[in-house]
Amino acid sequence: MAVSVTPIRDTKWLTLEVCREFQRGTCSRPDTECKFAHPSKSCQVENGRVIACFDSLKGRCSRENCKYLHPPPHLKTQLEINGRNNLIQQKNMAMLAQQMQLANAMMPGAPLQPVPMFSVAPSLATSASAAFNPYLGPVSPSLVPAEILPTAPMLVTGNPGVPVPAAAAAAAQKLMRTDRLEVCREYQRGNCNRGENDCRFAHPADSTMIDTNDNTVTVCMDYIKGRCSREKCKYFHPPAHLQAKIKAAQYQVNQAAAAQAAATAAAMGIPQAVLPPLPKRPALEKTNGATAVFNTGIFQYQQALANMQLQQHTAFLPPGSILCMTPATSVDTHNICRTSD
C-alpha cells in the first residue's frame, strides 16, 4: 500500500543560537571556537537565532552577501548531524503513516482515534517511557516534529474506546535517563571540598565530556559492567558510590516501565501473554536521541487488538472445493457436471 507523505520544509535543524556576548561586542572567543554563532552584518537574525546557509554546507554558495550564516567547521559538523537526524525522522514519519494505514485496513469498521499521549522533549533520551518501555516507546511523538502537530502530541491506537492512563503517563514523564549524571558545579569552580568518592555529583577529569545544555555527563555503561577496554573513553567512569546510584535508578525505571505496560495492557483489554517480553533499552544517538532503525513492533498493541477482533468476526471456511462439498441432490438440481446433457 503506497502512502504519499508530503515533504515538509523544515529549517529548524539549520537554526543556530547567536552568541549574546558577540552581539554586545564582548565575546573573547573567535567564531571558530565559540559554540554559538557569530553572524555577519548581512545575516538575518530573528529572536537571537540565525539560519545557516544550506548551500554553504554543500560548498556551493556563490552569493556575495548571503543573508544566511556560513558556519565555521565545528558548527558545520553539528548541523550535519542535525540534518541526518532530521532525515531519520522524516523516514520514520513515512513508515508510521504506512503502519497507520495498515492498521486501518485490518480494522475497517474501527476508525483510528487519536488518544492523548504524554509529551516528549526534542530528545527521546529525556523520555523514560520512550527509552525503556518497548510498548509505548516505539510509538513516540518524537518521531513527528512538534511543529507539524496541530495540538499536543497524540498516540494513535486501534481501539477507539480505551484511553492511555493519564496518571501512568505523567509518572513516566518525570523519569529521567539513568545513564547521565549531573556535574558538580562546585567542582567546576574549583572549590568543592568533597572528594570524587564522596560527592554525590560527578567530577569528570575531562571537561569535553560535559553536555553544556544540561551540565551532565554520559556514563560509560561498559565500565559499569566492567568491560570497558577503550584507552581514552569519551564517557564518564563513575566511582563506586555513583555506580550503585545508577544501578538503583535503572532498577526503579525498569519496574515503573513494566508496571506502566501492565496497566496499559489491562486498560486495553490485552492479556499479558499476547505482549512480547521486555527487551533491553534501545540504543539512542547522543545528539538528539533519534533512532537510526525503525522499530518493526511499532503497532504491537494495534496488531494484537486487530487479531483478537478478526478472530471473533471471521467466519470459518473449511478447505476444499465448494462443488465437492455440495450435496449430490443440489448438484443434480442445478444441472452441474451432467454428462447426459
Swiss-Prot record:
Highly expressed in cardiac and skeletal muscle. Weakly expressed in heart and eye (at protein level). Its main location: nucleus. The keyword Plastid does not apply. InterPro entries: Znf-CCCH_Muscleblind-like (IPR054429), Znf_CCCH (IPR000571). The modification Phosphothreonine is found at residue 6. Pfam families: zf-CCCH, zf-CCCH_10, zf-CCCH_2. It comes from the Eukaryota. GO terms for cellular component: cytoplasm; cytoplasmic stress granule; nucleus. Belongs to the muscleblind family. This is Muscleblind-like protein 1. It comes from Mus musculus (Mouse).
